[in-house]
Amino acid sequence: LETGSRERVTHVVKNGKVTICLTSPLNWKTSFGEEHSAHIAKHGDGVKDVAFAVENCKKTFEVAKSRGAEVVKELSTVEDKDGGSVTTATIKTYGDTTITFIERNNFKGFFMPGYIKKKEDPICNLIAQPSFGFIDHIVGNHAVGDMESTVQWFEKMLDFHRFWSIDDSIIHTEYR
């Protein structure tokens, strides 16, 4: 087992300022395995958690809690051997999706304390190297009539601001 965990495997892909973690359960009989296998059975492969880098994890988390956010994981800090640390906390959003706040404090590592960067694949030297600065949007699927309440949740809990709105006159799919 490359990670030492018999519960899960996570591969981290990083390009520019974008980091994506691909996690799968290895043991379906653990609480992690049961939770994630149920998510996969219900949704197929997909996003379970969206993480945001924040300047002050405690403050961001406490504000969201004070506004009614449902807590999934309380504040937790992990330190590395070089004196840096990473603080995280997770809240529930819509459906089965969660949001994790991540604050890096003098942490210089590749991903999180304890993770070791693997050698780059030699194929990377043979192909064009894109560089991602950010993810400009994500899509969440909602039942008809549920999107407005989700937008309002993000505005209330996280101070998100609507900069573009769409409705059925703009989006047309066969599933409407």
Per-segment meaning from a language model:
Residues L1, S5-E74, K81-S165, H172-R176:
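Glyoxalase I/VOC metalloenzyme domain signal
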